[in-house]
Amino acid sequence: MSLISMHGAWLSFSDLPLLDNAELHIEDNERVCLVGRNGAGKSTLMKILNREQGLDDGRIVYEQDLIVSRLQQDPPRNVTGSVYDFVAEGISEQAEYLKRYHEISHLVMTDPSDKNLNELAKVQEMLDHHGLWQLENRINEVLAQLGLEADMELSALSGGWLRKAALGRALVSGPKVLLLDEPTNHLDIEAIDWLEGFLKTFNGTIIFISHDRSFIRNMATRIVDLDRGKLVTYPGDYDTYLLEKEENLRVEELQNAEFDRKLAQEEVWIRQGIKARRTRNEGRVRALKAMRRERSERREVMGSAKMQVEEASRSGKIVFEMENVNYSVDGKVLVNDFSARVQRGDKIALIGPNGCGKTTLLKLMLGQLQADSGRIHCGTKLEVAYFDQHRAELDPDRTVMDNLAEGKQEVMVNGKPRHVLGYLQDFLFHPKRAMTPVRALSGGERNRLLLARLFLKPSNLLILDEPTNDLDVETLELLEELIDGYQGTVMLVSHDRQFVDNTVTECWIFEGEGRIGQYVGGYHDARGQQSQSMAQKQARTKSVAEPVVAKAETAKKSPAKMSYNLQRELEGLPQRLEELEAALEALQIQVADASFFTQPHDYTQKVLAELSQAEQALEEAFERWEYLESLKNGA
């Protein structure tokens, strides 16, 4: 028997139902990804499965005594108290007893008065009476699993840690089905990696919503697509789903075209003259009416957003130049002796944990903050369009239309006037939705509105700080295409690994203590180079001391002059170094070309491997030359 079975589900809040005779079956020990466009009803379906929202029609059957728990889409806001209290509230009926026990236990440690000891005894008696010691142990186990300190104040936690606390609250009830709504939102890449590992050890079923394609690929054992009120199951991985979904849409398009052709023929027949009416078949008339009704009820596939950047005139060749830049806040080093050059057309991602200084570096580059030391030079003719991750630019009380156009009826798009409603439809805002206050929008809709505003501004430098949060996959892919075709310079911050892979030619990785590594390629290319670089440094550190000692001992034992073969090798090394430098420079020029990463993945990986080998060969040749020179001078 399924853990959850939903039959003939119907739910509507407007003209178009969110669920239209939908069916769903959830089995034990599977990880189901629920996909669909923004506004399709995925979060509402999660609430239904968690018994928070009822159906207009249909029924849901749960396995007896099934425990379901849900992690909400946004991390908790404006919460106070300890982590322990917050997590304990996941067991709602017994939470007060457990919270009081935790509180009085700590109080007794600092003030073991008779009053406090008597209170502790009473609370312990209540725990005994209700059999709550097992729940106390479970809370402590969950806190330990998540690396959470019981006495940490919620108000002092970052978004990522609040997310962990919320996950602990969802887990503590011992659910057999765990519902996760956008679990990677507000998490950095390291936290996402941790979450993937943790969830794979979960003993139960996970149903999750995510637009992070890497996360879906790593987690999902089955895809359920919510499309126009129907739930369609696709067994297997995410890439298989994409292929099958595309084929299903192609077949649907052909079937609709054939249906429309037949309907048009019947409409011609019914409108023919007296001769046709004499032989009119009443059954055929009834069939035509049924076809008309079916056509009127058809829900078309939701269109894709149409984004276009208003590009300004070209900037100067050098966009930014930084030399030995340092910046600290309250004693914490965020940028340490950083030097870099950004040229026109570069597309660079800033990668690192939350709070490491990515947004700070962008503000330093734009002159919004002053560096402690070092030099930052901004290029000429820069026209900046800045996408803010905190969404502070939108007025929640004004409508979508007014937030975009300040009460005007037209906006300028590529130098031509365009009606606001028409422009907003390119970003999937129906005219009715354009009249809605911003406070009523979903996260994805707010993001689309910010992008609509951003792309009206002429620019040759795009600064995108977390642009992918809450965007559905189709809009994400369109944004990727837009960035790929953008002729200006792009600097972006994102924790979406595939988005970074698909958009940038260089990554700046924050490696701790203000150090920033610069690597060519997308996210996975950069991580590979970073790992290789660290391994080489460790190998060099290990080899430096040992050969030095060995060489010193050899020199003491054998002060004789160099052999003929070593002399010949030393004489040939300068030419060898020139050849290696030339080969390395040629590879660097090839990789730096803007079109390099548009070529096949296997080819780019081969060239990057050759680049790494060339760097290593040059370094080894220099070390060999220095060693032979030291032998020569000591001979």
Predicted regions and their residues:
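A short, polar/charged loop/turn motif at coil->beta-strand junctions and beta-hairpin connectors
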Residues: 264, 299-303, 314-316
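ABC ATP-binding cassette signature C-motif
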Residues: 1-257, 311-635
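Intracellular alpha-helical coupling/juxtamembrane segments of multi-pass membrane proteins
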Residues: 244-277, 281-287, 291-298
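Long, charged, glycine-rich C-terminal linkers/tails
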Residues: 301-309, 437
